[in-house]
């Protein structure tokens, strides 16, 4: 009875007259508005069911469907951009798209090999597209014949094979399910080329297809890690809650991500490829992809390097999140070999440093110029991206005493110079993706979050730690090409008589630094005057039009252009506490967005 009451929302039906009228507008917005694509964020605790996610800091995401058979090409033409959206991008009629299933026969699919690759890469759970926006189920479904078992010559259920392979190899397994968009169905959101907008009944879609299929996924594949929802769009709070309750009633330990919509879910999924600049509270993840698209595309060989993937993984973990990296198998069921080779190289590094990744805590420090830090109990792991040429790795802000220091397992010496810990490392960088210095402390971590500027590094002043007057930190999201999301945290909204951002930090020794400003400027603020004050240094300079592209809704509302301008030299004649203030010199320049200030040593 309790279970029936929880899911009864969908049995009884809810009046959705307003939803039908909104469907066309919402479908268009889902092409490029991040709020509609991903829903509201916010810290989530996950309660007891989310405890395992901290111990699974690295995961595999898989986009696989009928779009994989097309590989980004339709009717002799390549549709550039994320290829899993090809049905909508090419406006393929649902009847024509159904025929793709007639030739979809992924005989190279081997569940054990996929899971072994994830395991070799150091990943601990897998999420896969059970149904993406195209509406095709990659599992056997009684709710719709448009599924891989009934509609293709393959006739197998790869989700059952993957679920079993994950159990055999000790990985958790979960499903992606597109709850709002389904381009195969009149009653769902997204297909406005086959179906007249405003004629569908979204509640009927939920009742007849989405809920029955989600119930199948929760009932037929054993214990699952969770259901990964996406693009909530116009789904109502009651509908979102109904789906959450459905998942938790059938599998109480399964997680629901925040893209269920309306502020619900057990953990937060950030924007595609979004890595926060500073630590973030709660349970969260960053979904990223190994190349540019998510599903297989015949032309996309823009693979991220092993070092880039490892650094992105470390950045996410050091901020307190889980990094979920996507692969896109092709229409035959094979993960591209070049991608697999890159993942295995990443895995060799992860397996050598598992204690610094899985189950690790975020950094206790402020921004570190040379890299990132993760922690576990009384141990710190320093991930060094910029290797010190003088053999001295400098760490400021650590008050705890160091018992032992090791670099890739070998002992290294440390010394104190005032408030600074100096770690003596070889002049030659170790041959590994990211060298890791392990500091075993004599007691609990006692550290300051004060930022530092180091002479041997390219230093960034993070927007989130500045003291602000008459401006604010705003997230800027856009797509360079369709589906290729970019994210920046910018100083923006310059208003009032006093407008400035001030950073406090420490320098370890005297030095001179170039100041680079990365910004975007619309035409109306061209040649606006700006200034920097830092000790005895005062700089005045113009910021000029960066040539932003006019607004296009299909590209996230705008296509901003950022440029970097070297505005002058800042001198620090003495080490110690410093303050740098940046802001407009006049009353104009209200629309300029500043994404980074960098201090680069003068050499």
Feature roles, as predicted:
Residues 24-512, 522-559, 565, 569-571, ...:
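Mature catalytic domains of secreted/periplasmic carbohydrate-active enzymes
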Residues 8-18:
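Bacterial N-terminal signal peptides
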Residues 1-4:
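N-terminal secretory signal peptides that target proteins for export/translocation
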